[in-house]
Amino acid sequence: MSLRSNKAGFGYEVQRKMEANYDREEAQGTPRQIITWIIEVMASDDGKFEKPTEELLDWKSLCTYLRDGVVLCKFLNILLLKDNKSKVTFSKKVSNSFAAMTNIENFNKGCEAYGLAREFSFQSGDLWEVRKGPFYNVINCLHSLGFVANSKAFIPAYAGEVTKYMDRD
C-alpha cells in the first residue's frame, strides 16, 4: 500500500522486530521448506495441482502466491480430508479483497479444526497487505501446521526444524 505512512516509535520497533524474525526464519530455510511441502502435498492430490509458474525465491513472491487464500484452502483441504475432517469452503476465483479475506479466515478456521492452536493463526491482513513483517505470522502458522501434520503421520511429511529463540527485545 503506497498510501500507508511510515511507522514511528513503538510501531516502528514492532515492525523492525517482526522483519528481523522473518529474516531469521529465512536464514534457517523455513519459507523454502514450507513452500516445498505445500507443493509436494498438492502434487500428491491426483495430479490436479498446477505448480507455480515462477520460482518462489523471496518473501514477496511467496506472499503474492498465497495472498488470495485459494492455494492455502486447497492445501488445507487435502490435510483435512486425510484426517477425515470436513473441507473448508472457499472462493476459487477471487475478484476482490473481501473474497480473499474470507478465504484466509476459512483457512484459519480449518487449521483450528485440524488441530492447530488458535494462537498460531494469523490475521488476514498479515497476508493480504504483502508486508514482510506481518508475513512472518503466516510463515509461523504454516510452520506450526507442518508439525501438527507430522504428529498425525501425514505423508509427505513436513521437513521443517524446530527452532527455539530467546526473545531479548
What are these model-derived regions, one by one?
Residues 1-169:
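Alpha-helical coiled-coil scaffolding segments
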